[in-house]
């Protein structure tokens, strides 16, 4: 729950209203004075919806230089950001040959495997020489190598499940798997802030979807009670299947799932638990095994475990882990396994090598050091931001920490000021977040040194002063929320 002070809420609404008014005025002026330049195809339906087209032209274009900044280096603690210029008021951006060396607080490179690694990289290169860059085939044709089989065994062992299946894309893991698991006559109960891949997968399943308040087990139980009592729409027959979908760490909030309570409720009402560990696997827990290890939840109590290899493991793709019967069923039914090209062998080798480093099977203790460092870095950075007076979302141990901006004018102001000081940050606004809840999302890595973090804090503090986003008094004992505020989920 985020509480916005009234003054901040009013100024944010006013800013959006001003942008909307000027956008409408410009459209009206163009209709009158530049009518011959319009390119309306008679008889064709518009490709873009009117409100989406307006948002892109009149709001997004003003600040699009703050998004999708290209880089020309590995996503390490420091990256080379390619400079871009525009000669048409930001409508189009042209890349230049100049780069800026920036401290990287935007990548999901939690354990630092995204750049050269003394153990992983040589094995990836050797795999590339032996297997090439692609299998050029799906898993059921000629796209399964010994490395793919080894990776599935490695993942199953690592996450504590009997079996696993891997996919070439993390997003597609959710969006393609959920429709295979459940369909018409089934019920999906989803956290209100679940990732888009989960939302799209649920919509594509044909199942009935109900949403519970973000990370609130009490409301989840209320929804379960109501839906079980009511049954299917119109017929009121019992649900064929109920799946509760949650995330380990919520990527836009940095909050850790209340998994023990959710698992207990699902057991009580005989609902399956689907856990998305995209941002938690490898990043939290004593040995990097995610939210189950951190919170002491037995992995046998989680029916479907999903995760990606793009964050902590420095590769690509995703996985589903569960019972042997479940995995065998998915291998025979899931389109992402049957028809999509399998994950490249070098990418699979990178994941296997990273897991071996994490578990100490490379003959060193670098994995344990990385896990200790990501936790120490995350908690240090979060505490320092809060002392400065920023409104920071999320929980301790989480490497994801959003800083609330709220006002749309502060999105480009904060982003550009940080870039000017050679700090690369990610800013997020509508429609990725609710209209009033724009934020900067900080991602901490084990590859960051203490000096890196101190420099980042100095830059963020300066940018926060200039943009007015320090919503709390400096160095508070505890972040207190204003009594009079507007509460938003």
Curated annotation (Swiss-Prot):
Localisation: Endoplasmic reticulum membrane
Disruption phenotype: No visible phenotype. Lcb2a and lcb2b double mutant is not viable due to pollen lethality.
Membrane topology annotation: Single-pass membrane protein
Residues found modified as N6-(pyridoxal phosphate)lysine: 311
Pathway: Lipid metabolism; sphingolipid metabolism
One GO BP: sphingolipid biosynthetic process
UniProt-recorded Gene Ontology molecular function terms: pyridoxal phosphate binding; serine C-palmitoyltransferase activity
Superkingdom to which the source organism belongs: Eukaryota
Protein name per its UniProtKB record: Long chain base biosynthesis protein 2b
Source organism: Arabidopsis thaliana (Mouse-ear cress)
Quaternary structure and interacting proteins, as annotated: Heterodimer with LCB1. Component of the serine palmitoyltransferase (SPT) complex, composed of LCB1 and LCB2 (LCB2a or LCB2b).
Function noted in UniProt: Serine palmitoyltransferase (SPT). The heterodimer formed with LCB1 constitutes the catalytic core. Plays an important role during male gametogenesis and embryogenesis.
